[in-house]
């Protein structure tokens, strides 16, 4: 990425956004009737689909059941056509396992698991197209799917990435910005309380700049919350209308 100007002198990024500006977000809930909950989201050109099953009885060994809360199971996969590599990823490869673990940690912090002891909640997320901010898109899609399933949560959990270029914090990184290799992080936030569900850093960032980049990600995550809240309200309204017919 040598010689590629990620931020112009006028403060514009390669795709025309300002430093703290989100990519366009579009989302729908209830896209799979067979699942207990489902959602589809587009964040820029990154597209993700999430389906949720549960709470239901523990599958497999009952010894896995937790006496005081639900077991949260998250699985991540990416379509073979999701990136320009066209590389077949075996199910359960390292990246998929790491992403599944990050998603589980995120949603264990957000779901009121104590309301459903000795049960299991399954969250499956697939990335259909990857163009930066993959983890964030997965979290935001899964949040809508969990809500669609009617599973109680402490709050929305909203995620966004951020990076640092030429002394400026950039929110919601595209693939080109991620590939440039600068410092970047991903943040999952419970916006009402400000609680951090997950914070993941991909490279070193000087402590003098950490607060600035973290605030850019948090501000962007709050912007995501505003948009997801509208999606939920619209979905509830549409469901109420269809029930009334």
Curated annotation (Swiss-Prot):
GO terms for MF: mRNA 3'-UTR AU-rich region binding
Supply the source organism for this entry.
Answer: Mus musculus (Mouse)
Biological process (GO), any one: DNA deamination
Name of this chain's protein? Exosome complex component RRP41
Q: Which residues carry this modification: N-acetylalanine?
A: 2
Gene3D superfamilies per record: GHMP Kinase, N-terminal domain (3.30.230.70)
What is said about its interaction partners and assembly?
Answer: Component of the RNA exosome core complex (Exo-9), composed of EXOSC1, EXOSC2, EXOSC3, EXOSC4, EXOSC5, EXOSC6, EXOSC7, EXOSC8 and EXOSC9; within the complex interacts with EXOSC2, EXOSC7 and EXOSC9. The catalytically inactive RNA exosome core complex (Exo-9) associates with the catalytic subunit EXOSC10/RRP6. Exo-9 may associate with DIS3 to form the nucleolar exosome complex, or DIS3L to form the cytoplasmic exosome complex.
**Family statement drawn from the similarity comment of this UniProt entry:** Belongs to the RNase PH family.
| Keywords per UniProt | Acetylation, Cytoplasm, Exosome, Nucleus, RNA-binding, rRNA processing
Q: Give the CC-aspect GO terms.
A: cytoplasmic exosome (RNase complex); cytosol; euchromatin; exosome (RNase complex); nuclear exosome (RNase complex); nucleolar exosome (RNase complex); nucleolus; nucleoplasm
Provide the primary localization: cytoplasm
Cross-referenced InterPro entries? ExoRNase_PH_dom1 (IPR001247), ExoRNase_PH_dom2 (IPR015847), ExoRNase_PH_dom2_sf (IPR036345), PNPase/RNase_PH_dom_sf (IPR027408), Ribosomal_Su5_D2-typ_SF (IPR020568), RNase_PH (IPR050080)
Location in the cell: Cytoplasm; Nucleus, Nucleolus; Nucleus; Nucleus, Nucleoplasm
What the protein does comes down to: Non-catalytic component of the RNA exosome complex which has 3'->5' exoribonuclease activity and participates in a multitude of cellular RNA processing and degradation events. In the nucleus, the RNA exosome complex is involved in proper maturation of stable RNA species such as rRNA, snRNA and snoRNA, in the elimination of RNA processing by-products and non-coding 'pervasive' transcripts, such as antisense RNA species and promoter-upstream transcripts (PROMPTs), and of mRNAs with processing defects, thereby limiting or excluding their export to the cytoplasm.
């Amino acid at each position: 990425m040598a010689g590629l100007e990620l931020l112009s002198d006028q403060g514009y990024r390669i795709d025309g956004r300002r430093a703290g500006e989100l990519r366009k977000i579009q989302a729908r809930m209830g896209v799979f009737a067979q699942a207990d909950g489902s959602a589809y989201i587009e964040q820029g050109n990154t597209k993700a689909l999430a389906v949720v099953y549960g709470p239901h009885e523990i599958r497999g060994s009952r010894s896995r059941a937790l006496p005081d809360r639900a077991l949260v199971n998250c699985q991540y996969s990416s379509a073979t056509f999701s990136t320009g590599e066209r590389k077949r990823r075996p199910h359960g490869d390292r990246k998929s396992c790491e992403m599944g673990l990050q998603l589980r940690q995120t949603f264990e912090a957000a779901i009121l698991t104590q309301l459903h002891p000795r049960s299991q909640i399954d969250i499956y997320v697939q990335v259909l197209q990857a163009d930066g901010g993959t983890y964030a898109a997965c979290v935001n899609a899964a949040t809508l799917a969990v809500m669609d399933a009617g599973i109680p949560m402490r709050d929305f959990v909203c995620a966004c990435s951020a990076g640092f270029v030429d002394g400026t914090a950039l929110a919601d990184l595209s693939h080109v910005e991620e590939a440039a290799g600068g410092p970047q992080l991903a943040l999952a936030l419970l916006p009402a309380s400000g609680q951090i569900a997950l914070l993941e850093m991909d490279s070193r960032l000087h402590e003098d700049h950490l607060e600035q980049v973290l605030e850019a990600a948090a501000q962007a995550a709050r912007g995501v919350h505003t948009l997801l809240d509208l999606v939920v309200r619209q979905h509830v309204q549409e469901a109420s209308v269809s029930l009334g017919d």
